[in-house]
Amino acid sequence: MHHVNKYFNQTMVIEALKMSFYKLNPKQLIKNPIMFVVEVGMVLTLILICFPDIFGTSYLSRGYLITIFIILLITILFANFSEAFAEGRGKAQADSLRQAQSNLTARLIEENGAYRIVNATELKAGQNIRVENGETIPADGVVINGLATVDESAITGESAPVIKESGGDFDGVIGGTLVTSDWLEIRVESEAGTSFLDKMIALVEGAERNKTPNEIALFTLLTTLTIIFLVVIVTLYPIASYLHLILPIAMLIALTVCLIPTTIGGLLSAIGIAGMDRVTQFNVLAKSGRAVEVCGDVDVMILDKTGTITYGNRIASEFLPVNQQMLEKLIVAAYMSSIYDDTPEGKSIVRLAKQMYINELPKDIDGTYKPFTAETRMSGIITNEISVFKGAPNSMINLVKQQQGNIPLNIESLCMDVSSKGGTPLIVIENNVMLGVIYLKDVIKDGLVERFTELRKMGIETVMCTGDNALTAATIAKEAGVDRFVAECKPEDKIKVIKDEQAKGHIVAMTGDGTNDAPALAQANIGLAMNSGTISAKEAANLIDLDSNPTKLIEVVKIGKQLLMTRGALTTFSLANDVAKYFAILPALMMSTIPEMTSLNIMHLSSPKSAIISALIFNALIIVALIPIAMKGVKVKGYSIDRIFINNMLIYGLGGLIVPFLGIKLIDMIVQFFV
């Protein structure tokens, strides 16, 4: 979805602030052990405010303790806000989607052709409805009659209306979208609770998102580091006593909060939620957060040619007769074989024939139409006088041979010429006589070459699977820029391709929409099923594209990469922060008792009290500063993995070491006048 910015509004910020206070509940906060430690420290500080000498005599004033308490509270609120804000984006999206389907009625077409107005929630799959200009489509469905423009901006964010008509790839409509011209008759495909909008709303408001294995592993590491720092602080107290250094409990609490990885601890949940939301904004349903995360590890992508690499609607561009005298006969025969063919290819053949034939072609032909099937790989019409068919070269040659017909000497070279150009050849026969070849042109989708180049730099190999012959496949693969191809590939062959790649240790992603794709979708590490596909395909996949656009697999994989890189970059920054804060604060605390520590106080912090307050303020502010990065993710450019690693180490590793020194010093220059 492309209308993300409108969710960054005042209402959402206010709701996130409210949720920040609600999440102060220890039952909520204990899910994040790092921030729970901060809350425990905050409670202990509150006790010290009420009873300053409960843990022994302290030289810290009540005002100083209140300052520490407030900063700790703000730190927790900032961390809660980042998570609530990420959740709020999804909820705002759900509210927007819910408005699109509220209070809708439908014009139901009765069996006698009459219309009856009903509530949209009463519609059943299989019923037919009529929607006219200015009306909202009440349910998901397929156009069976009419042609109109439809505004889908409420769903996709795209302002330009799209044309919907029966047949082809543009016959699916989504409930909640607006008809902006003419009228449509639609066969309902979904019932109340199962529509596109319902699925989107269920995703963003559904069950609690479980942590992914990588997230759990990182949480375990961060929790371990927190425990280690707690042990360090606990042992620091007796060491300080031995050195006759007075370290009040409140100062030790503040030091603990500064040293444990609060930055990434406060942002980790938000990073995962924001990653899921970014996938949702592309109208992709992820069955789990793990599916999105695995996308980041994908290094092999299995892509269908038709619909993914090419537009899917192959267009008739030329008639190639076996000899020039046969051209008119070829045009008429191609037209006759396609007049009842509702596929985009068939319609394009009819259009081309009308353009090229100077005489008028018949509008209706009395005969029996034979549709294309996967078994016959041909289609055509049989009348009392003639039979005309078009189809795949192998099928047509075999048919002519079975009926003892003649195979023109140049028919194979004509087919080879078409294949060498990346097109698909269809042979046309009339009464078992080969007339020539129809050149169906495959059109490569715009921008794919650049995207495949970017994926290659990121270490992802692309493999094109196609039913075309090797020559056609090689031409398309070269033009599109994919790394490898598998020609004459049947759906069941994809499983072998996937298993072979997995046996080499690769993480494989693929797309599919049919029942025959289901085993391969289940076998792949990431399976992206089309919403227009079969139920079995959608059940086998772990991602569902509600727009039924196979090319989205590329975007989803990039989002997965971005999620992992964002988590890694901010973890690096957080840990580098902790190291920097350790060397910034400890010398300032110890220099009064251990003069040798003065040389390590490179920032010349004013006093232990100002050093602690400055570090606490910086600790809270850095969480807020990093929220936009957690929400949007770090930029994933078309660099190699090594280049990205080096960039992140320079920006977030080295930056994580330098920024605390500068930040704490600047804050200390102000704080020293108040403590």
Swiss-Prot record:
Binding site for ATP: 341, 345, 372-379, 390
GO molecular function: ATP binding; ATP hydrolysis activity; magnesium ion binding; P-type potassium transmembrane transporter activity
Active site, renumbered: 304
Residues binding Mg(2+): 513, 517
Keywords linked to the UniProt accession: ATP-binding, Cell membrane, Ion transport, Magnesium, Membrane, Metal-binding, Nucleotide-binding, Phosphoprotein, Potassium, Potassium transport, Translocase, Transmembrane, Transmembrane helix, Transport
Signal peptide start and end residues: none
Coarse class of the protein's main subcellular location: membrane
Gene3D superfamilies reported for this sequence: Calcium-transporting ATPase, cytoplasmic domain N (3.40.1110.10), Calcium-transporting ATPase, cytoplasmic transduction domain A (2.70.150.10), HAD superfamily/HAD-like (3.40.50.1000)
GO cellular component labels: plasma membrane
Entries under NCBIfam families matching the protein: ATPase_P-type (TIGR01494), kdpB (TIGR01497)
Recorded family membership: Belongs to the cation transport ATPase (P-type) (TC 3.A.3) family. Type IA subfamily.
Record's subunit section: The system is composed of three essential subunits: KdpA, KdpB and KdpC.
Name this polypeptide is given: Potassium-transporting ATPase ATP-binding subunit 2
Organism, scientific name: Staphylococcus aureus (strain Mu50 / ATCC 700699)
Lineage: Bacteria, Bacillati, Bacillota, Bacilli, Bacillales
